[in-house]
Every structure is written in C-alpha cells, then in structure tokens.
Amino acid sequence: MYACAGKREIVTEEKQVLPAVEDVVMYEINPRVFALKNAFNVISKHLDSIQFLGVNVVWFMPIYEIGEVNTVNSPYCIKDYKRINPEFGTVEEFKRLVELCHEKGISVILDWVANHTSWDHAWIKEHKEWYTQDSIGNIISPAGTGWNDVADLNYDNADMCLAMIDAMKYWIQEVGVDGFRCDAADYVPYTFWKQAVDSLRAIPNRKLLMLAEGKRKDHFDAGFDMNYAWDLME
C-alpha cells in the first residue's frame, strides 16, 4: 500500500532522515508477503528496490508477538507489545533492518494496535480492570466490530494508558523507529492520543511521524501529522 550485534548507536534528531509531512512517500510492508520465516532478513535484501520507487517512509504492519487463544492468526491480535513475532526474526534483526533503512534515507514507522489485545495477553490475568467488561464482569471484544479474537481495552484506566505509552516509547528509544501508524484510531479516546503523542514527542532529540487510521478531526489536535479514513474509498 502507498500513502500521500554490538552496541547500537542511538538515533538522534540530527541523524534522522524523517521527511517533511508534505514530502512523504510511504510504502506499507506486510512481512508475511516477503517470506514465511526470517522476513526481516529477506526484506533487507529488497530495500534498494523499495528505495528505487521513491519511498522515504516504510510502514511495517504489526511485528509483535500474536495471541493463540481464539486466534485467526491476525497480526493485529497482540500478545506482547514489546516482543517480536518469532516468525519474522529477532529484535536484533529488526534493529539492523531499521538501521539499513536509515542508511538509505528511509524512515520507519510501526503499526500500533492500541484498541485491543489478544485474549492471552498477560494483562488479561494481571489487570482485568484494564479491559472493558460487561454487566457481570466478563471482558468483552470491541463492541459492534465482530473482532472476537481480541479483547477491548479500557481507556478509563490511567495505569493501562501509562503502560501503553511505555511500550510505544520502547520502540523509539530502544529500536530506533521514527513513529507509528495507529490502527483503529477512532476507537481510542482523544484524551489518550493527546497524552501519548505529547509523551512521545517529549523524548529528547527525536522527531516523529504519527499517522492515524481514522477520520476524526481531533486526531490533529492530539498531535498526529496525518490521518486517513476508508470512507475515501466509498
């Protein structure tokens, strides 16, 4: 999809290659399309071809560990926000892929799934209050979606919000990504996005690109650079 081993050197703002928003040429990468296993290493061999297209930002579909309970094998069913899906490779291999992208003048953003988790995420047992519940206390899927493989998160819980932001910071500070494409952003309250984007942009010496999947105008007030809605295709 297009849209308008050793100690790793920390990426700083001066060394980032992030393009201006109006100059973004974005390429979506589904790792499963590139390879059935070790996708990160395979993708690294195709960066010249991607660069040849004029791409200056790559958006990776979710690369995180996915759940096994009620699964439909969707990459949007996150079991652990800080762990790599082993079918794609290791975190060190992904760090190297990010570095290779940067060397070619390509920024990297990650698909971020903030609306829900898998049913076997550790939070289900450790923090039931972090999830939306029905009248008798059962955790539920996102209402009206039919997404039965995932559990809906409760954004009225401040501790859950902080844990989510902490996980997002990990990928910027430890892995070196340049921002996020935030999945189903319209389902997540403005108050969280404002808190999250402000916290991420406060990370010293880093610039970020933030893309929201949604049509709400308040995404821009929350600090997103861009958004898009599927209504445009109708």
Predicted feature descriptions by range:
Residues 8-41, 45-56, 62-175, 195-205, ...:
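Substrate-binding/active-site clefts of carbohydrate-active enzymes
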Residues 167, 173, 183-234:
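Active-site-proximal helices and loops of the catalytic beta/alpha 8
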